[in-house]
Amino acid sequence: MDVNSRLSVQSNVESPLMPEDSEPQQITSSAAGSLAGSITACKKVLRSNSLLESTDYWLQNQRTPCQIGFVEDESENCASVCFVNLDVNKDGCSTENLQQKLVNVSPDLPKLINSMNVQKPKENEIVLLSGLASGNRQADFDVSQCPWLPDICLVQCARGNRPNSTNCIIFEINKFLIGLEVVQERQLHLETSVLKLEDDTNCSLSSIEEDFLTASEHLEEEIEVEDCKSGLETINVSANVLESKRPKEATQEGWDYHKEILHCALGEKHIRKHRMPSMKTERSKENTAENTALQSLNPSARPSRLKSEVAGSKQPATNYSYPENIRGEIETSQMLFIPRDAYLSMVSSCGVLTEQGSNHRDHDATPNSLPPVQNGEATAGEYATNLAESVMQDAFIRLSQSQPTLPQESAVSFSVGSALLPSGCCTKDMVVPRSWNELPKIVIVQSPEGSDTAPEPSVSSWPDLEVSVETPGIFSEESSSRPTQSALEVALACAATVIGTTSSPQATERFTMEQESLVSTYTQRGNGIQQTPVPRVFMGPSTTEYSFPSALCGMTQVASAVAVCGLGEREEVTYSVAPSDLLPTPGASEERSSIGSLVTEESTELGKEAIAEALLREATLVLARPNAYSSVGELLESVNRRIIETTSKTQMLCTENVRRNELAHTLSNVILKHSIDELHQKNIMAHPTEERHPGGTLNTLMESVNQLLHNVMCFTFRKMNHIVTLGEHPSFDKAAGHAWVKASACSSSHPSSNAHGTGLVIRDLVEDASPKPDKGGARPELVNNPRLQSEFSCSHRMLDSTARTFPKEMYPKGIVGEDTRNPLHTLSYDSSEQRTSTDIGKLTTVGEVRSTFQESEDSIVPKAQEKHTCATTLNNEAQINLSLLGDDLVVPDQSTLEAKQSEVYGITNFAEELAETVVSMATEIAAICLDNSHGKQPWFCAWKRGNEFLMTPNASCRSLKRKKENSGTGSTVRKHKPPRLSEIKRKADEHPELKEKLMNRVMDESMNLEDIPDSVSTFANEVAAKIMNLTEFSTVDGVWQTQSCSRNRLLGGDRWNRLKASSCESIPEEDSEARVFVNSLGLMSTLSQPVSRASSVSKQSSCESITDEFSRFMVKQMENEGRGFELLLDYYAGKNASSILNSAIQQACQKNDHLNVRPSCPSKQSSTESITEEFYKYMLRDIAKENKDGALSRRSSHDWSTGLLSPSARSPLCYRQSSMPDSRSPCSRLTVNAPIKANSLDGFAQNCPQDSINVQPVSRASSSGLCKSDSCLYRRSGTDQITNMLIHETWASSIEALMRKNKIIADDGEAANASPGPVSGGSPSQVEKCANRLVTGTGHKGPALLVQESVDYQRKDAVTEGNCSPVSSPSKMAPVKKPSGFDPTRETSACHNAVALKSPRRSLCSREVPLIQIETDQKEECVGESETLLPQSGSLEEAEGPQPEETIPDVARSEDTALSACQSSQDSLETREELEVDVLKEDITLDESRNPPSSSEESTGSWSQLANEEDNPDDTSSFLQLSERSMSNGNTSGTSSLGIMDLDIYQESIPSSPMINELVEEKEILKEQSESVKERASGLPGRAASPQRSLLVINFDLEPECPDAELRATLQWIAASELGIPTIYFKKSQESRIEKFLDVVKLVHQKSWKVGDIFHAVVQYCKMHAEQKEGTPSLFDWLLELG
């Protein structure tokens, strides 16, 4: 290769493209980036284990589709992505043609693609190239400059052979996700700073570049000539960290772009190594060395797959800057000028070599004169290299996928002649050259610099090491992202490198020469660690020659030894000893050969156990005494000697005492189980297409077991060392005994808190024994945690290893708990833990762990307790450990669980957790109760905490629980008999698994079930009973029966008065499922009215904040019920929630009159009387009034019962998401149709302007990411906030709102009372004011959002019902809408539609409102920005001038949307209504679906305005147009009714509201909108996860007829929606079927389809397509037909 080509190897980073995919894409980025314009190539491999790979996830995806826009080909003001589809049907296609096509995209493309052709991207792979020159212009990172994007994604269409496979579709979506996300990130980077990566490393790119440039100047002299000759630009191959900035799992497969690219694109270039983080460097070294070593493009270069790959990018040869090199390297290492080629191979092998060596200062020291190796000199060595590489490749890939990477600190470099400079090492360390066939020495160097960066992620000892600046940046990223590399991995890498270098003679020769010149030894102090120079050693061996086979054998041996000893890794890291400087001693090579021969000749004779034992002993020695060997040579000698010795005594190996054997078996079982689980998981996660070979399985198992054993050894020895060390203080035995005694005492006294006790003991012990109590007890509270785990969980980040180790040492539990996330720390002791380790990145959820734990417990340590006891008697360390271990295993039941939980969540999180639990439970319960109208008791499937995995609910368990009650109840609504505490306990006892699961929820050691005061339990039961009796539950079931309605009313009223206000109001629930909303909403509203109607108001009032009461009650409940009985808590919370919900619904249900508060309401006394009471009374009155109205109420009730959609089918199991919503995981969503969460009070207050509660399903947008059950709660802000909101915001705001409302009610209420419909005459202004307040206040909190949605519906309703009375219409509308509930996503806000009462159907129809929602969503999204959005809305409203001026100002203030609503004329309303009706018709049959469009204009005006306040500015008419427009316009809110997107959409749509005016204006509007949208997007909070930026998607096909353009566009639409991109644009010229696409978009918005709906439709289409083959309509046509 040309000497000039410069390779900068960068760490692979995996970016979590999807919020969902925690490890969905393992991305190996091999990028080449040159300083000036570098091309970055990053290959991402989609992994099947990603959430995004889950069909369920997509089918249940509730995100709102983003908007679609089309732009003229010229427009370039938008970030863009080009998806290049490399699929070609016939290879016969003229290559030149294809090449030309690629050149059109970018002149760089053909070269890059050719270089990749060796390994064409597979279906699950996507290659991201950025920095390519644009086809017609200079590529510039400035997107506006580049017609193509900075990111060109090369995708091989996955649809080729399996066009109909769902997996294919998902893969495609994920590819698009990756591409789009990369562009988003790039935009962010560009905006924030291109140097972010460097910022991380604390060195700016420029500074690094300068350093390198300086260094390179020296090289330039040599290189320039060559460069000129070659005329090639050097390609900077550096993984663009910027690009792949997100460090993810270290496990990434990479392509060796650099290999191929280097070969192809770079051709001959000098590869300058950029210093990579050592970890990475090693890999990259191997990869690059091998890759670069190959002068040819041999596929063998594949090592590229190694995680670290280098991508080649072009850069002027003169550009020698090593952006990635960090200054530190400059300081510490001397710049080695390695002959380009030799270095190439060497460097690639060293990865870091040159960089390390490239310290500018040193650079002069190194001879620049090294002659470059001739490219032509490649010899048979290449063949060997390729062979070796291919052989090693699989291992590397496997390793990269499954194991953490090496600790950055210790870079183990095996390089030819150890030329490899350890990354921290000076090049001076370079070894003397050997002949090419001579086996290279292994140089293990600890990079002092690298260690710094790695510290947090890597082993605790790191802190001791210095990290060179160069490594840090990348390093830190990598290290932080990935666990340290396993020894095996390192060994393999070394072996591969060695083999590669060995096989490449030229490189070796070169290297030899260089080494000779550089023989000078260099001692480097890494943090005071001295590395002894061993360079001369190499010289001696250089004379020896090895045959390739022997070399391989030798290398294998060395690798094995190294792997076993873990020299390269942990020991060094842990002890911060620098075995790293173990350079091979002169004898090393001989040893190697001897070992090789020994192995080859005697391996059959040696007892396997003997060899294993010998290696193990060496490993233990190394671990226990890191300084035992001064060099690898010594180690090898020792290993050799030991193997021979042990072989002779094989027979003695198995003599173990019985107890030890038992323990060994136990551990063996645990480890094996864990390994198998891991393997299983891997298999599952592996790409479906990958085949499983038995050999691979065995390898994987071995690998897993080795890792576990290694970890166990490391921990054991580390701890042993600590104990021994500590033993100097209190005697070891004493300490151990002391710890044990204390632990045992604790455990005996409190079995459940055993872990806890132990932790304390350990802490004490640490304090006594450890001179460094600060370390040992660094985090006492953690120590207290049952498992010191939390304390240790930081381990990789880390406490001093000693600190962690000590307590863990003392207490295995700690060990087990150590760091489940860090595979290094996982102990095989605990199966559950192991499982965790398997997940590494993810802790298994507690429940899972629990179950596993139990299994392991049963299978493994049935007698753990006994062992434990035995152990107590023993004083020696081993026994202590055993006992501890046993204890660990044994205790699983509570202490372990608790411990686990605490490990995962610190005690500090308990309160938060509790709150979350309460909230989520309440929501869930309400949902379940609603679901269980048949008297089933809500048994919750435990939601496993920890990883936020859904624990599969115990279906049988739940069904059993429910069955009992089912049998008697039938469909009629029966009172739900609340389970008594005793009953719950009994059931829990009967179903231990259930109990266990329940216990996962809230476990506070401090709680004692026994303390439950009777009064509390009584109250709880009472509340539960009342709640259970509430109609909601039964009604929501969707089995609404008229009789049940009446009955419900009676029951409801009764209950209401009896229920304590606090309990009733306790938790408002929000529904995350928009669809569910529709149904449940309607039901709920219906239910609620009857419920409240019959009752008397509860007299429990007290101005005391409901919040206080509620929170007190809940806390009490929790404390009392405690632990395993969260069930009760759930019950109560649920009941409270449901009651609140009921009340809210009732309000909503009080159809038109809701809003009109009658003077009779106690509103005036709000200050003194409990707001709750007033609220209820008020509701009751409304109900009564409605009853009087008769026709209305009857109609409404009828509508409710008949017209309500039955709740959408619920998944049989209700998954309770721990209150942590996992927006990503489909499971996280409760499938249960959440009852509409009326923010009971919140909604009420917000809607109070309308005087009706908006029982609006929370807008999809906000909730989309949340679990259905909890989403409402979470939607708004996230767990913490949720809790806050629940208790404080919700209550406070609702109370406040209620008070205001009451006042309002007092003023206007009388009027309202006078005339339920029209009476509200004066209320509008008040309502508006209130609404404004609510909007501004609540908007932020999220109620506003709800209101907005509801407003949309209501607005329609209001408009329709405007006739009745503009003022009253709002209230009417609200009820109607609620009934309509129709808008699954929309909240039907009673507030908005007084009219709704009249047109319940319409409210159903209001579905369309979702379009309006667009603006609403904006508000929601804007909640933070609500005010800004509102102004926009205001403008819209103004635009919609028709709205009554009087209302407009207020409305505008409160919500511009309201204005727009007002604005909409009756016609528009009618139209909209019709549309809505049509939409509703699908779901709703209400005859009333259309309310008379006759609603008076005035009513529409005032109401509309009011509605608009909450509704989107878009009026029904404008909105409808908008929706159409939005459909057509990418900018307009394509997802008006879609949740989150709505906001974005709103943002866009608001600006685009004018667009709504005419479709004709779409194009222009699109442009304007896109601009405005962009502006807004930037301003809008949008999704935190993704920048709200619009993207231009360009699709480029080598063969245009290949892909299904419509399908692709649809999938891209889905991907963009998933990422929260507000709008994606397509080039008009590319999207031939623009009109149809726009129609489809319009349809989707009209139908309020979510991403999941679109995905489902696509899947159906593909299936159909597969079946019919011919005559299938195009996707768009089919969708339109479907619609």
UniProtKB/Swiss-Prot annotation:
Listed name of the protein: A-kinase anchor protein SPHKAP
Extent of Polar residues compositional bias: 1-14, 289-301, 1362-1371
Molecular function as annotated in GO: protein kinase A binding
Renumbered residue ranges of the record's region Disordered: 1-30, 275-320, 582-601, 960-983, 1359-1387, 1415-1518
TM regions (residue ranges): none
Comp. bias intervals (Low complexity): 1492-1504
Gene designation: Sphkap
Record's subunit section: Interacts (via the PKA-RII subunit binding domain) with the RI subunit of PKA. Interacts with SPHK1; the interaction greatly reduces SPHK1 activity.
